[in-house]
Each structure stands twice: as structure tokens, then as C-alpha cells.
């Protein structure tokens, strides 16, 4: 007879495998929610500063800083840092020990430990000569799509005073992160708590972040126009101080000239800018900054040299 078509039974037809969704990313730390926007703004500069960095080994480095200013006496700082062998990312190495001591004997120290694959611990100490000012202990757990942190600040069992801070962040989508912060403080005759809600939305070229609570609000917007230009906008309102500030920051990178420019304008009539210039092949970076507050009629400028 004629040709016949061999048809496969319905059950034998190939099926499309279900599309696997990518797992949600970890939202990171609560303290880093506004980091991208803050990195756009220039740091305050005043006086003359010389910084000499020296790498002693793959694990240990030191830095010497001399600062001279018209607002105070000259100062010297010795900075030392130790980094271990366990590197989780280009910016995360465990254990890490960092210390900074000035000419008056005051010390700022920080210790970072990786207790388990997802559990991290941090201890911070600050002294003024022979007196302890601050001691703080942090524990952070990073899940697949969430981060939980608990902080104890200045715990004093005898004086019955303590500051407890709890953070939680959850990735709802690849772009949206929601969470909150609870700050509890207690000392003799006083006790209170402040709750703050937080949200962050990340697009391809911009990031918007908002913190709202009984203590005030903090909103930031970061936009990367291209490889050279970044801008940031910040809004901060403090209900206790009855103060509101609006700031605009500008970041310009000129790779061919080895220069970086940062500028700011805020609602307090303050204008400032910092220009950094690298001097290859020498390991030297020059920085020049100036800030003017029109409302208070204050002007200060600074110059720094970083070697290494």
C-alpha cells in the first residue's frame, strides 16, 4: 500500500524542561545600603596630610600618617592591618585585624572573624589613652537570600546599661530588598527602642534606597551615567534634632589623566570639591580639596600626599 507516516504516541512527545529560576542573591549588610551613593561624595579635607603605606608581607601592612592643621595641634597616626588566608571575595579576607593609634596613645581596633561558612563575628574597641570608650560585638549570619545581624554596644552588667541593635534584610526579587532595624538602649533611669524600616531597589544603572522610622528618614539615589560619570542624591531628616538636609554629589573619573573629581552641594549652602591625581609610575597620589559654607561664612581647604 502507500506510504504511511509513523507518528509517535502522545506520551512519547518530548517535553520542555521547566525553566529554572536563578536563586535570589544575598542582600549584603544593612550598613552598606547607602554605600554606593555615599562613595560619590567627597570626604572633608582640612590642613596638610602625608600618608605613607608600606606592605611588609602578603598578610601584614602598616601606614604612617602625619596631619597638620590650623584648627589644632599636629598629629601622628600609626595604622597596622593583618589579613589571613581565607579570602571569600576580593574585598573580604578572614581573619582580619586592624588597628590605629595616635600620638596621644588612643587606639581604635577592629577584629573580623569567620566562625563558619555563613557566620561572621566582629569586635570593635576604642580607647582614649588608658580609658575604654567603646566596645562593640557583632554577629552576622548570611543566608542564601537574607542577612541577620545582632550587635551589642558597651555592655555593662554592673551599671545595667547596654545598646542592642538588630538588623534583618531579605531579597524579595533580584532587584528588591526589604528589611528593618531595631535599636534598643537601656541605662539607669532610661530605656527606649527605635524601629526603622528599609527598602532598596537596584536597576541596571541606578539604585534607590529608603530608611523610614520614628527617628527620621534617610533616602538616597545613585545613578551611573557611564563609565566616567556617577551622581548621587541624599535626603536626611532627623526628628529629634528637627533638622533636614538635602545633598547632591558628583563623581567624575578621567582614566587617561589618572584623575578623579568629586563635588557636592547641599541645602546648608555648602559647596565642596576634592580632586585626586595619581602620578604613575610613582606610587604617589595627590589630593586637593576645598569646602565653603556660605551660610556660616566658613572656608577650609586641604592637601594630602599618599605614598604607596
UniProtKB/Swiss-Prot annotation:
One Pfam family named in its UniProt record: Porin_3
CDD domains: Porin3_Tom40
InterPro entries on file: Porin_dom_sf, Porin_Euk/Tom40, Tom40
Region: Required for mitochondrial targeting, residue numbers: 281-308
Keywords noted in UniProt: Membrane, Mitochondrion, Mitochondrion outer membrane, Protein transport, Transmembrane, Transmembrane beta strand, Transport
GO CC terms, sorted: mitochondrial outer membrane translocase complex
Topology in membrane: Multi-pass membrane protein
Single Gene Ontology BP annotation: protein import into mitochondrial matrix
Subcellular localization, as worded in the UniProt entry: Mitochondrion outer membrane
Keyword hit for Mitochondrion: yes
Disulfide bonds: none
Tree of life domain: Eukaryota
GO terms for MF: protein transmembrane transporter activity
Transmembrane parts of this sequence: none
Region listing for Disordered, in residue ranges: 1-29
Record text on subunit structure and interactions: Forms part of the preprotein translocase of the outer mitochondrial membrane (TOM complex) containing TOMM22, TOMM40, TOMM40L and TOMM70. Interacts with mitochondrial targeting sequences.
Family: Belongs to the Tom40 family.
Role of this protein: Potential channel-forming protein implicated in import of protein precursors into mitochondria.
Protein name per Swiss-Prot or TrEMBL: Mitochondrial import receptor subunit TOM40B
Amino acid at each position: 500500500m502507500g506510504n504511511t507516516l509513523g507518528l509517535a504516541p502522545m506520551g512519547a512527545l518530548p517535553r520542555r524542561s521547566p525553566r529554572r529560576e536563578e536563586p535570589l542573591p544575598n542582600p549584603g549588610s544593612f550598613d552598606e545600603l547607602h554605600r554606593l551613593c555615599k562613595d560619590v561624595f567627597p570626604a572633608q579635607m582640612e590642613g596638610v596630610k602625608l600618608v605613607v603605606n608600606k606592605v611588609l608581607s602578603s598578610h601584614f601592612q602598616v601606614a604612617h600618617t602625619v596631619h597638620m592643621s590650623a584648627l589644632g595641634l599636629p598629629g601622628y597616626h600609626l595604622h597596622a592591618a593583618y589579613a589571613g588566608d581565607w579570602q571569600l571575595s576580593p574585598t573580604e579576607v578572614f581573619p582580619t585585624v586592624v588597628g590605629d593609634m595616635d600620638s596621644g596613645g588612643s587606639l581604635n581596633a577592629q577584629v573580623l572573624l569567620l566562625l563558619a561558612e555563613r557566620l561572621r563575628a566582629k569586635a570593635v574597641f576604642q580607647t582614649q589613652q588608658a580609658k575604654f570608650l567603646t566596645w562593640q560585638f557583632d554577629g552576622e549570619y548570611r543566608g542564601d537570600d537574607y542577612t541577620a545581624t545582632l550587635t551589642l554596644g558597651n555592655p555593662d552588667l554592673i551599671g545595667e546599661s547596654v545598646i542592642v541593635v538588630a538588623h534583618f534584610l531579605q531579597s524579595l526579587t533580584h532587584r528588591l530588598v526589604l528589611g528593618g532595624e531595631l535599636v534598643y538602649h537601656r541605662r539607669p533611669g532610661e530605656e527606649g527602642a527605635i524601629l526603622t524600616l528599609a527598602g532598596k531597589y537596584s536597576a541596571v544603572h541606578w539604585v534607590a534606597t529608603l530608611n523610614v522610622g520614628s527617628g527620621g528618614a534617610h533616602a538616597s539615589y545613585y545613578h551611573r551615567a557611564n563609565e566616567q560619570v556617577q551622581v548621587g542624591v541624599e535626603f536626611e531628616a532627623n526628628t529629634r534634632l528637627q533638622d533636614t538636609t538635602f545633598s547632591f554629589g558628583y563623581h567624575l573619573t578621567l582614566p587617561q589623566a589618572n584623575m578623579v573629581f568629586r563635588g557636592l552641594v547641599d541645602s546648608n549652602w555648602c559647596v565642596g570639591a576634592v580632586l585626586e591625581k595619581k602620578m604613575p609610575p610613582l606610587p604617589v597620589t595627590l589630593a586637593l580639596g576645598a569646602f565653603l559654607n556660605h551660610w556660616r561664612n566658613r572656608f577650609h581647604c586641604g592637601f594630602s600626599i599618599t605614598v604607596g
